[in-house]
Amino acid sequence: MSRYRGPRLKKIRRLGALPGLTRKTPKSRSNLKKKFHSGKKEQYRIRLQEKQKLRFHYGLTERQLLRYVQIAGKAKRSTGQVLLQLLEMRLDNILFRLGMASTIPGARQLVNHRHILVNGRIVNIPSFRCKPRDIITTKDNQRSKGLVQNSIASSDPGKLPKHLTIDTLEYKGLVNKILDRKWVGLKINELLVVEY
């Protein structure tokens, strides 16, 4: 299955807030909510919705998510927490959390167009797994810095997680450590995703 490119607000209405997908928020439509979401939720439906939240928030395909679940299952720690750590340490997500991109798809585009350096090397793979003490910077040209400057100016510095630091003057971010569960920017029950 390919990456989702359709209407984003429809997904937000169905699944709830997905800050990585878009900054837009749907208008309140209480009548429609009662119409479509009546009745008891089955266990399968609950698990499917949690999985879809994770997929659409991080912009993953079905196959990528399955691969991350398999990697997390081999770890000795809690599978759900390892899964979230793997997803949060992706380069496109770290750019989004630093405020260098307004959404995760925007961060993917920055990486694909070779505007981002990790430890002084150009990285054009959005799923690149960052490690502690990685330094993330923009290319040293005006165009790259202009793209990141707009996003940094509009981002909220109070929402920066503890495992990341950013220098807004030099357009440089630093990964301090692997994140804790409480700093994940998405309300999700990761155990339901693993069970699915």
From Swiss-Prot:
Pfam families linked to this entry: Ribosomal_S4, S4
Q: Where in the cell is it found?
A: Plastid, Chloroplast
GO MF term set = rRNA binding; structural constituent of ribosome
Region (Disordered): which ranges?
17-38
Any one cellular-component term (Gene Ontology): chloroplast
Bias-annotated ranges (Basic residues): 24-38
Sorted alphabetically, the Gene Ontology BP terms of this entry are:
ribosomal small subunit biogenesis; translation
Q: What is this protein called?
A: Small ribosomal subunit protein uS4c
- The organism is Lygeum spartum
